[in-house]
From Swiss-Prot:
Binding-site list for substrate: S95, H96, N97, H98, R117, Q241, E313, S314, Q315, S534
HAMAP family in the cross-refs: PurL_2 (MF_00420)
Protein name listed in UniProt: Phosphoribosylformylglycinamidine synthase subunit PurL
One function term, GO molecular function aspect: magnesium ion binding
Pfam families xref list: AIRS, AIRS_C, FGAR-AT_linker
Residues holding Mg(2+) 2: D118, D269
Annotated catalytic residues: H50, H96
Metabolic or biological pathway: Purine metabolism; IMP biosynthesis via de novo pathway; 5-amino-1-(5-phospho-D-ribosyl)imidazole from N(2)-formyl-N(1)-(5-phospho-D-ribosyl)glycinamide: step 1/2
GO cellular component, one term: cytoplasm
Gene3D superfamilies: PurM-like C-terminal domain (3.90.650.10), PurM-like, N-terminal domain (3.30.1330.10)
Subcellular localization: Cytoplasm
EC number of this enzyme: 6.3.5.3
CDD domains xref list: PurL_repeat1 (cd02203), PurL_repeat2 (cd02204)
């Protein structure tokens, strides 16, 4: 097959497309000839790591994905769960790591835009966004610039589009110096019986291009996301897409309108690999062929080649299969919204993917093989070495308890991230019940009493030290945060960020974390319904910390009965629920106070997580709990300080028990724990009920005053704590020493 004006296919050209020699040989055998330049680009896009999951697919099969409330699991644009009353929640999380490092503002904006499209492609109206951001060491010369650009990009897109950004994570670690992580999650609401899917159906059905015009931005974006970085990575700036939130808002409204009119047979957003991936997936999932005529594609630049049009990742675009009798009605709707509408092809019975341009056939490929016959690798992997348990008595504290608390709260890991989330509109739409800064966001479901509890969680240092326990803990933390606001955890989406899978130690981390995630999801009845894998997060051979971010969704039957972490009044008994051993391995205290980043992380007892969480949720629903907070990073005393600072009510705390050294008691990071306050009148009944179900519970103090006062220790004024807690990040971003 010879096409005019295309470069010859050479080994160098093949390599530049990210294809290994054996993969190219596979293409030659599949076609029985040399591919055209456009076909090479199509294979490069469909067979890269970002689109094909060729290194991860065999391991992803072990995740639990089913439950009675799951309508759609992995494999579609987003996951869908039933929340009753004919309503469904549609949600997913994806990464935009590589583009955000190269061009932080545009990389972040298009990450948000892409995940929003995944949600409304399914027929849902987006109601909330969350994100998890990982940056390098604050002292790295690029970190401040990257933080500024990414945060502005996330806020700029979400605010303009009109969806609240209600929660997230921000972390700093030197292992992200050369590869930041930008993980974006979107959540939407839809009618449970009106979910739209990507699979085309019917022969000779019109395939319609909708939305913004195609340009040269983003070409090879998916391929870039499937390779390591090096010192020249910033030269890849042209591969970063450019987003327009106002165009996306128009696209949302137009799509929802034609869905309501019954025009749509199948729909797929143009994300990674653009027109190529959307058309191939639509046809292959429907067991049909696709015939595209690129002469009909709306373009914003002159002289674009077939190769460029097929691989462009210009934003705010959709591909649909329409009912033929609804073409004119659909076109009128899109014209009304000022968006492009063009019939660019049709479905065919031949299971071929044919691309035409300027009178030439630029590509003629077997469509199923493009999608389902991508290389599948069971890459070598080695387990991470088992690290020793750190004995608390072997740790020499360098600071008093009070001094350590003040220092920890004024450091990057635990300081307030208000500077970040105040740049996001977290209340637009008027349905945000609990704002950022708590355990989980709570968003009201319109036209009823229900609410959604939303969170994103992961502790990468645990995953590095013990991938299996780290994977379990990421899920357990999401489950715990949803529980702490009164939500019933329903399902998760995951964003699996790892280094180069061709290194056995990295692949071992991936496999270990995935096994931990699967174990926790199974034990907690918390299925995975969508997700994303981002590999090759390395620069010059130095990989990120393994970061399997978990996005959790839970349901509250009555959002007015949600719990929050703030102490509500003086004189409330403070209860610690869960077992405390004083586990210091991989704790923030050990790392930031003792300068020791070592040891085994805390083990996660999933039975205890389930038992303790169910009890706490029951206390919230019964109206017994007046404040609730889970214990995680920084341990017990940090969690207590956060509760006190939230509303300016202090606490008088008992001394640590004699069996545990004080710094391990206050700063250990044992799992499956909650702090709950109750009215004095309910104390005896709470102890009785928890003892009956074998849930550990002790009283550790009383709320009151304006300081954190531990018996036998120096008291710490809340104003002093808040000053350090609130000032580190704005001071850092302002360049203050």
């Amino acid at each position: 097959m010879i096409v005019r004006n295309e470069p010859p296919i050479t080994p160098e050209l093949v390599a530049s497309h990210g294809l290994k020699p054996d993969e190219y040989e596979r293409i030659l055998k599949l076609l029985g000839r040399t591919p055209t330049f456009t076909e090479l680009g199509i294979f490069s896009a469909m067979w890269n790591e970002h689109c094909s999951y060729k290194s991860s697919r065999i391991h992803l099969r072990g995740l639990p994905t089913k439950a009675p409330w799951v309508i759609q699991g992995p494999g579609e644009n987003a996951g869908v769960i039933d929340i009753g009353d004919g309503q469904a929640v549609v949600f997913k999380m994806e990464s935009h790591n590589h583009p955000s490092y190269i061009e932080p503002y545009q990389g972040a904006t298009t990450g948000v835009g892409g995940i929003l499209r995944d949600v409304f492609t399914m027929g849902a109206r987006p109601i909330a966004c969350l994100n998890a951001l990982s940056f390098g060491d604050p002292s790295h010369p690029k970190t401040r610039h990257l933080v500024s650009g990414v945060v502005a990009g996330v806020g700029g897109y979400g605010n303009s589009f009109g969806v609240p950004t209600v929660g997230g994570q921000v972390r700093f670690h030197t292992r992200y110096d050369g590869n930041i992580l930008v993980n974006a999650m979107a959540v939407g609401l839809a009618d449970a019986d009106r979910i739209f899917y990507a699979a085309a159906s019917g022969v000779n059905m019109p395939i319609v291009y909708l939305g913004s015009k195609t340009g040269r931005d983003g070409i090879h974006g998916a391929t870039m996301a499937s390779a390591e970085f090096d010192d020249d990575s910033e030269e890849k700036r042209p591969t970063v897409q450019v987003g327009d939130p106002f165009a996306e808002k128009l696209l949302l409204e137009a799509c929802l309108e034609i869905m309501a009119k019954g025009c749509v047979v199948a729909i797929q957003d143009m994300g990674a690999a653009g027109l190529t991936c959307s058309a191939v997936e639509m046809g292959a999932k429907g067991d049909l062929g696709v015939d595209l005529d690129l002469d009909s594609v709306p373009t914003r630049e002159t002289g674009m080649s077939a190769y460029e049009m097929m691989l462009s990742e210009s934003q705010e675009r959709m591909l649909m299969v329409l009912k033929p009798e609804k073409e004119k009605e659909a076109e009128a709707i899109f014209r009304k919204w000022g968006l492009d509408f063009a019939i660019v092809g049709s479905t065919t019975p031949g299971r071929r993917f044919v691309v035409r341009h300027g009178g030439d056939v630029m590509a003629d490929l077997p469509i199923k093989e493009l999608e389902s016959e991508a290389p599948l690798y069971d890459r070598p992997h080695v387990p991470s070495p088992q690290l020793p348990v750190i004995q608390a008595r072997d740790v020499a504290p360098s600071l008093t308890t009070a001094d350590a608390l003040e220092k920890l709260l004024a450091m990057p890991e635990l300081c307030s991230k208000r500077w970040v989330w105040e740049q996001y509109d977290h209340v637009i739409g008027g349905n945000t019940v609990q704002r950022p800064g708590g355990d989980a966001a709570v968003v009201r479901v319109e036209d009823g009493p229900k609410g959604l509890a939303l969170t994103v969680d992961v502790t990468p240092r645990y995953c590095e030290a013990d991938p299996f326990e780290g994977g379990k803990q990421a899920v357990a933390e999401a489950w715990r945060n949803i529980t702490a606001v009164g939500g019933r955890p329903l399902a998760i989406t995951d964003n699996l960020n790892f280094g180069n899978p061709e290194r056995p130690e990295n692949m071992g981390q991936f496999v270990g974390c995935l096994k931990g995630i699967a174990a926790a999801c199974t034990a907690l009845d918390f299925p995975v319904v969508s997700g994303n894998v981002s590999l090759y997060n390395e620069t010059n051979g130095r990989g990120i910390l393994p970061t399997p971010t978990i996005g959790g969704v839970g349901l509250l039957d009555d959002f007015t009965k949600s719990a929050s972490l703030a102490f509500k009044a003086e004189g409330h008994p403070i209860l610690l629920i869960g077992d405390t051993q004083g586990w210091l391995g991989q704790s923030v205290y050990l790392r930031d106070i003792c300068r020791r980043e070592e040891g085994a992380p805390p083990p996660v007892d999933l039975a205890a997580e389930k038992r303790n969480g169910d009890v706490v949720r029951g206390m919230i629903h019964a109206g017994t709990a007046t404040a609730v907070h889970d214990v995680s990073d920084g341990g017990l005393l940090v969690a207590l300080a956060e509760m006190a600072m939230a509303d300016g009510i202090g606490a008088a705390l008992d001394a640590a028990p004699a069996a545990i050294v004080p710094y391990a008691w206050w700063f250990g990071e044992d799992q499956a724990r909650y702090i709950v306050t109750v009215h004095e009148r309910d104390l005896l009944s709470v102890f009785t009920k928890l003892k009956a179900v074998n849930v550990p519970c002790i009283q550790i103090g009383l709320t009151g005053g304006h300081e954190i006062a531990i018996a036998g220790e120096r008291a710490v004024d809340l104003k002093v704590l808040r000053q350090g807690f609130e000032s580190w990040l704005p001071d850092y971003m302002a360049g203050k020493p």
